[in-house]
Amino acid sequence: MCEVKVFKQEDGQETLLLKDVYLIEQEDEGLRFETIFGEQKVYKAEIESVSLTDNKVVIKEKA
């Protein structure tokens, strides 16, 4: 399985939000993330970048 870490981009810094994310879905209120442990989070954000080689997703707050 290919899980990713989700980071928030803010003021030039990346902050780790979630680990072991296997599902990302676009919803009306933003992005929904689900981990392999069943934890779910929704962020009012958009994807800034995705690195498959680093298993990393960077999001930023919606303007």
Question: What is the meaning of each model-derived region?
Answer:
Residues C2-A63:
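Compact, glycine-rich, soluble single-domain proteins
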